Amino acid sequence: STPFDLKSVELLVRLGLKRLKLPSGEITNAPLLLKAASTGKPVILSTGMSTFEEVADALGVLAFGYLGDGRVPCVKAFKKAYASGAGRETLKGKVILLHCTTQYPACFRDVNLRAMDTLRSAFSLPAGLSDHTEGIAVPIAAIARGASVIEKHFTLDKLLPGPDHMASLEPDELKDMVMAIRNVEEALGSPVKKPADGEIENIAAVRKSLVASRPVRKGESFTGKNISVKRPAAGA
């Protein structure tokens, strides 16, 4: 669940949540980030509206909070925590970044899904997508690009008042999205290039072999005039 203030963090801890979701609007809220990290719980951090530098700064605050070495919190200490080996290792086990376009609904041209790849490679952290586009195409594409987490708003009726509902999925759509994602995950399969088990039985029928294109006399040489290539692969 998502806390928007310090007391909400405490409430979620008391409720026994295993992970905290920090929204895009709080990425510059250092006290909230510190409070979340001080619980020791893993966090999912949305990065909508953020620059690359702001994401790095937020990770510094989280690293400082997780390390909890008693130093006075300040920008210098945050940067030092993020630059330290201990800080980076702690973040790897605690933080997932979500690329996000904070727009309701988000336009496809503004999604910039490749930025999710940038977050993953630049910060060496798992990355996913908090999606506000209409439909389910973008979350499915994100999974194909290696997203670790998909966040999608859910509603019982898109016509309800408020900015979130029109960018949310109704029950049947959510079911379709999950099923499509599971299919894509299965289809991603292995990076090893080899025939799939289901292909083996088709090799003989689909590939071709050399066959005589006309009667060949004993002792006659094979040439392009008396042989051809045809299915199945049961000839020479």
Spell out what each predicted region is:
Residues 1-236:
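Catalytic cores and adjacent flexible loops of soluble metabolic enzymes
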